């Protein structure tokens, strides 16, 4: 399966591939 987008992104960047920092400050699938 795909990596889960669940990390926080207070700096505006997500480490998980295919994830965007939206809605801030949580990463979600883009």
From Swiss-Prot:
Cystine pairs: 5-19, 9-21, 14-27
Pfam families: Cyclotide
GO biological process: defense response
Family matches, as SUPFAM superfamilies: Cyclotides (SSF57038)
Keywords annotated in UniProt: Disulfide bond, Knottin, Plant defense
Positions bearing the Cyclopeptide (Gly-Asn) cross-link: 1-30
InterPro entries tied to this protein: Cyclotide, Cyclotide_moebius_CS, Cyclotide_sf
PTM description: This is a cyclic peptide.
Biological role: Probably participates in a plant defense mechanism.
Domain statement: The presence of a 'disulfide through disulfide knot' structurally defines this protein as a knottin.
Entry's family note: Belongs to the cyclotide family. Moebius subfamily.
Identification of the protein by name: Varv peptide B
Organism: Viola arvensis (European field pansy)
């Amino acid at each position: 399966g795909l990596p889960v987008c669940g990390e926080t992104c207070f700096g505006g960047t997500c480490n998980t591939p295919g994830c965007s920092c939206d809605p801030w400050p949580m990463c979600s699938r883009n």
